[in-house]
Amino acid sequence: RAGERWRGEGRDWRVQDVLAWVTPWLDESARNWLASLDPRGDLPEIALETESGFDTYAVTARLHGVAGRSTHGLPGFDNLTGLLTFSPERGQLELDSQRVRVDTAGLLRLPLDFDRLHGTIAWQRDMDGLRLDSASLEMANSDFNGRFWGSVTLPDRGEPVLDLRGHYQDVRIGREQ
């Protein structure tokens, strides 16, 4: 403890255990959102910093094999590895994952399986909703290699807005049997 600042660190936690611990401090909206996401997986390292109680906080967590269901217009995922940093207003996920499954929640007929998923996704909450941005998200599997960038806006009311661009390489096109 330094003045009104606190810092805590932990190792080898599970996502489920951390959520059980923090859930009582979350408002009902956040509890419901996290419950529908149903996150699970391992947190080899996690750090929490606060100022003035928990009004202002920042979390940094190393992720390993993290999974969650698709919800609130966001895709589901399985086996994410990387670094997550967030505060009440914003966050960032630096991905460095292998053998990842992404469930697009009906946007595509089948989930997407990637041999590699690498890049950064940042988000920021404002009065109107949630905005996700990525300068580069690289993915590869046996059917293609691709690099994408852009933004997704998830308004509290109305339809999501996507502004995505990308390049495909090594695309394998075949007939579904």
List PLM regions with ranges.
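Extended amphipathic, helix-rich lipid-handling scaffolds
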Residues: 1-70, 82-84, 89-90, 94-177
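Short consensus segments that form the blades of beta-propeller domains
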Residues: 73-74
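Short coil-to-beta strand junction motifs in C2/discoidin
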Residues: 78-79
